[in-house]
Amino acid sequence: HDDYKKYHHAIVWGGGNVAMDCARSLVRIIDDVKVVYRRSEEEMPANKVEIRDARKEGVVFNFLENIKESLRDENGQVVGAKVVKMELGEPDESGRRSTHEVADSEYVEKADLIVMAIGQKVNFKPLHDSLEKKEGHVSSLENVYIMGDAYTGPATIGSAVLEGKALAKEIVQSFEE
């Protein structure tokens, strides 16, 4: 998109499939794209083919690093990120290895665009308690459809777009019946 052509140094913060989608899209229009991820490549949840392809396209990976804050100029424009090096600890409750900041390891990474693509868990329990999934994306409530993460669990942006198109056709067909 033309709006992004004004940027020169992008940081994508995260290690999942959405981060890979963002980084791979940005590297096609911005020369300097880095992915900052707080764990090692082995712990990275993104699809390994996506990581490999992002690397081939020119995305640089900064593993075992985390963003502490974005830095802005006097006009409020992003000019960089304060980054800290991380080290792996023992596994947490989820089984993933915990991370800890390395003392005195902060540095500034130049950036005029920071994309936050860190995982967030959404609590769908209240929704699931009141909805029963019927055929396709139809729920037990009239004119209420289920899609996206509520339907499939966490997935990629690309799969959400395809699913949205399929659901739109499904809704149109229901009106035609």
Language-model-derived ranges and their functions:
Residues 1-48, 107, 113, 117-132, ...:
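Rossmann-like dinucleotide/flavin-binding elements
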Residues 7, 67, 76-78:
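A broad structural signal for short, well-ordered beta-strand segments within beta-sheet-rich domains
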Residues 58-67:
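A conserved beta-strand/loop element that lines the FAD pocket in flavoprotein oxidoreductases
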Residues 67-70, 137-138:
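A structural signal for short hydrophobic beta-strand segments in well-ordered beta-sheet cores
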Residues 72-106:
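Conserved beta-strand-loop-beta-strand element in the redox core of flavoprotein oxidoreductases
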